[in-house]
């Protein structure tokens, strides 16, 4: 099979796939190419980490069980470097603890094998779509001391900028657009992720916890027991 172009300007974007099973890597490559993406494949974690730094892909698909460095460690190092490229874990592991650990490290989604290659390509497209297409005139959102700029995709707690992953940003923005409205976990999965995550509603809880930890005392997020989440409406 000929190599898929890796020039991100020639296609919809470059996707880096870190997968040590050749058959699975080729299958992912084929479906991503059909969707219009360039694809670069690495077979071990160390090479994948170096390639991510060098190529600056639009998104990364990481197998958890990679040789050299596993996918979890690759994601951990990326986030430690303040690299917020969208990361989707692709793995045979289906244990809830593994899923939660991956999400807590800043992964945007978690896909377990066997998976539908077409759905995987759709999830990549969904993550990338959320980072683009915001009208230039869309005003910043403010709730309490938290300010979110949907155009530049930046979040501030007071005067300090807070680094969020793509999904953390989108989740916070969705809640801040309707202060006081309570969303169920199922609603948030449908409206923010656009599909049912393999990690289930637990993925919402993990991302909410991560946002709270990063915003600290200024976090406007409120848990409504037995229902879901909301942001505190500003006081008048």
Q: Where would I find each of the regions flagged by the language model?
A:
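Residue-level signal for beta-strand positions within conserved beta-sheet cores that form or flank
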Residues: 11, 35, 83, 144, ...
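Short, Lys/Arg-enriched segments at the junction into DNA-binding effector domains
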Residues: 11-14, 125-182
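Positively charged, aromatic-enriched patches within helix-turn-helix-type DNA-binding elements
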Residues: 107, 112, 154-220, 225-227, ...
């Amino acid at each position: 099979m000929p190599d898929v172009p890796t020039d991100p300007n020639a296609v919809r974007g470059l996707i880096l796939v870190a997968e040590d099973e050749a058959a699975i890597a080729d299958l992912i490559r084929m479906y991503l190419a059909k969707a219009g993406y360039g694809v670069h494949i690495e077979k071990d974690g160390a090479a994948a980490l170096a390639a991510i730094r060098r190529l600056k892909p639009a998104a990364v698909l990481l197998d958890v069980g990679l040789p050299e460095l596993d996918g979890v460690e690759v994601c951990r190092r990326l986030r430690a470097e303040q690299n917020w490229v969208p990361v989707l874990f692709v793995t045979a592991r289906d244990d809830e603890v593994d899923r939660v650990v991956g999400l807590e490290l800043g992964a945007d989604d978690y896909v377990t094998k066997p998976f539908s290659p077409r759905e995987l390509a759709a999830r990549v497209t969904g993550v990338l779509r959320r980072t683009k297409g915001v009208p230039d005139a869309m005003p910043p959102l403010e709730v309490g001391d938290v300010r979110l700029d949907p155009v530049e995709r930046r979040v501030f707690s007071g005067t300090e900028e807070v680094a969020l992953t793509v999904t953390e940003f989108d989740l916070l923005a969705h809640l801040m657009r309707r202060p006081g409205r309570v969303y169920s976990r199922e609603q948030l999965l449908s409206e923010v992720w656009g599909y049912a995550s393999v990690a289930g509603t637990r993925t919402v809880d993990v991302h909410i916890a991560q946002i709270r930890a990063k915003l600290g005392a200024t976090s406007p997020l409120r848990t409504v027991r037995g229902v879901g989440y909301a942001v505190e409406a500003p006081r008048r």
